Regions:
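A cytosolic small-molecule/anion-sensing beta-strand core signal
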Residues: 26, 54-55, 70-71, 89
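A short glycine-rich, His/Asp/Glu-containing loop-to-beta-strand
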Residues: 6-41, 47
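Short acidic-glycine-tyrosine-enriched beta hairpin
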Residues: 63-79
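Short beta-strand His + acidic residue motifs that chelate non-heme Fe in jelly-roll/DSBH
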Residues: 60-61, 77, 82-88, 93-95
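Double-stranded beta-helix
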Residues: 2-10, 23, 88-119
């Protein structure tokens, strides 16, 4: 295993809301994604989800509050909590998620990704 340069990996793709797998460890996957606009409200019944912002500002709308995640910060959405990521401008994130997680959780939408591309 060699080091992975996150910026070089981000340079390999342009599509939005379509996470790319860059690694796995201990039943977890490490994903990179570029976001812009609004995602769907969804939840992951059995998995927590970590959003780490590398570039930009991410808003995560919950049913009862709004979370703002700035560059260099992360937020963990607890399992079972409905959330909707929003990016007014392009945002680059790293996601740490269990391998069992489904992209749009309990919702099937046009943007749902069944299998993450490895880069």
């Amino acid at each position: 295993m060699s080091t992975i340069n996150i910026q070089e990996k981000f340079n390999l793709f342009d599509d939005l809301w379509s996470p790319k797998k860059v690694g796995e460890l201990n039943g977890q996957q490490i994903l990179l994604a570029k976001l812009k606009g609004e995602f769907v409200f969804h939840k992951h019944e059995f998995e927590d989800e970590l959003f780490m912002v590398i570039k930009g500002t991410l808003t995560i709308e919950l049913r009862d509050k709004i979370i703002t995640v700035e560059e260099g910060e992360f937020y963990i959405v607890p399992k079972g909590v409905a959330h909707k990521p929003i990016a007014k401008e392009e945002v680059h994130i790293v996601l740490f998620e269990p391998l069992s997680i489904k992209h749009t959780g309990d919702v099937i939408a046009d943007i749902t990704v069944e299998t993450y591309e490895e880069i």
